[in-house]
Amino acid sequence: MVTGFVQSLIKLCGLNWTAPDFTTLCRRQKYIDIQISYQKSRDGLHLLVDSTGLKFLGEGEWKRKKHQPEYRRQWRKLHIGIDAETLQIRAVQLTTNNVSDSQVLGDLLDQIPQDEHIDSVYTDGAYDTKRCRQLNTDRNELLRTVNLAKQCFSGRTLWKKWSGYHQRSLVETKMHCIKLLGDKLSARNFDSQVDEIHARMAILNKFTELGQPHTQVVT
């Protein structure tokens, strides 16, 4: 159906092209190099980092609820870093579900150009490791991981206000936008899954580039 629709559009444009079929697209997907465009922040970069899971094998939630868990369910883990100012995705990494968040932070930071200054990195407690602290020190960022000692000293509410931890809600919103494009991966090959994710990230950045709503607190 989709192939016929695309072929009709090509014909209306007066082009002598042939619409590729689904099999051809699937085979060529893993060889496509998708570039994710973005806009730089006016000031220093404040990077918000988080991860989520995407299913690529197994039945839906309704069948699992009615007929007990599906043992063949498999997941990929998506790690992203977004700009707190532009809300565009600046770093993305797809891994297997047995890779911890702290192991991927270095790969995410490496995707940020070395000549671009990173003011701070906002993460959750999963990144509160010695290795992650060293990675942030190497890039001269102000580490914003959960610090239990400071929380106990000042209280959780004051600590969140002082550290700016509430900004992490922005990356949670971006995760929701990603899931709106699909909460599972259609490709089975890992390289194809990476390209599928990069395509989604490129689309989301284009949408974000069109503009964000302006909000104002009403009291």
Model-flagged regions — what are they?
Residues 4-8, 15-133, 179, 201, ...:
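Polybasic low-complexity intrinsically disordered regions
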Residues 13-16, 206-207:
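Short arginine-rich
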Residues 66, 117, 153-167, 180-197, ...:
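Short, solvent-exposed helix-loop connector elements
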Residues 101-104, 170, 174, 198:
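Catalytic-loop motifs flanking and including active-site residues across diverse enzymes
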Residues 125-177:
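Helix-centered, glycine/charged polyanion-binding patches within enzymatic domains
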Residues 177, 181-184, 205, 209-210:
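Hydrophobic alpha-helical segments
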Residues 199-219:
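Charged phosphate-binding loop/patch that engages nucleotide di/tri-phosphates or the phosphate backbone
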